Amino acid sequence: MSDNDSVPKPATQNLIYGLNDKLSPPKATLAALQQVLAMFVGTITPPTIVANALDLPFEQKAYLISMSLLCSGLGTLVQVAAWGRIGSGLLSMTGTSFAFITPLILAGQAGGLPLMFGMCLLLAPVEVILAPFLPKLQKIFTPLVAGVVVLLIGLLLIPTTLGGMASPANESMHPITNLAIAGCVLLIVLTLSSLHMPWARMSAALLALLAGYLFCMKMGMVTRPDTTSSWLAIPHPFKYGLAFDWPFVLPFAFMYLVTTIESIGDFTACSELSGEPTSGPIYWKRIRGGVFADGLNSMVAAVLNSFPNTTFSQNNGVIQLTGIASRQVGYYAAGVLIFFGLVPGIGSWLASVPPPVMSGLTILLFGLIATAGIRIIMRTTLDHRSLLILAVSLGVGIGIGFEPDIMKPLPDAIENVFSSGITSGGLTALVLNIFLPKKK
């Protein structure tokens, strides 16, 4: 009896195409486009937010967006193909992680792009090292710890998007115009997401982005980028160089731990929706391979001047919606993302999206991240001990997140590590989870 047969598979009444089933090229292309639509805005949002926060030149912003799409395609290819012990072998779509936005901004303010990419590259092996030991580490990195961190990520990113609503895309425009544009974009997303039409829900963010962009263009709020200079965006490894600063080791390492925990949940959900085992040797082989691939993909992303990659949970919803879990779709989707990343005009167009338009989208995206954290927390039993951990870690994280100046009296090395509410709150949850006595 094989390992696959020894472990019961979950019921998959809605599954039409299984993991290794083949689709005709038209069907595979359509399914791949649905997967790309579900993750497209989420993939370009982290580089856009970071570039805006650091006030990077337009050319650098466009290049970061292009490389994020390219690396998402390459990462998806590695996950789907599963060469040896690398990759999950599932229809696991890979995109740019939201978890690193805050440490990336802090590193960028301290040392620019070289420090950002240097720290990403230096700490990416954390996931590679952790991968073989994941079953034993689950008692330490519990859903409660992961949920606290994900909740803090969502809550503390929301203020960054409010700045985009207030900053004028055009100095001649009244500030209320920006709020109106962001509100209309948000309304479009909510309306489309509420419809009982699969295509509308999957493409809601992209359609709202397009509508907001066209409106701003008509209002003269968009500077049309020059897309005629080159037909191909050739990746330049280490284009901006590398730099390292040890105070940033802990924040970046901790975020890689967090994304590891998130990825385990994503791979488990993908396995269940694909009709594959969610326990046993085959399951753990996929988990280890998937997390290993996340670390490897993040290393490649840093080399190619992009930010850390992780699996996207929203794409599991597409599998559930369409009933298509075939790896073949992943190959097609990876090809689409790589194509988008290699065409400079796409990155330039996305970089020219006015801040109010992007803010209308990201306020919803960051809110959804916060609710995802709540869902993760609800997986655990909220007894007195868990509530203490939750209360203290959220208090520390939110407090420092909104008032980071309270860390200024401390030495610079400590301030740089703990001035992030996400890091300080997450580490508080981790330490309390280890040392608070459990009920016997």
Residue ranges and their predicted role:
Residues K27-A38, T43, H174-V185, S203-A204, ...:
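Hydrophobic, membrane-embedded alpha-helices of multi-pass small-molecule transporters
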Residues S2-S92, A99-A107:
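N-terminal signal-anchor module of multipass membrane proteins
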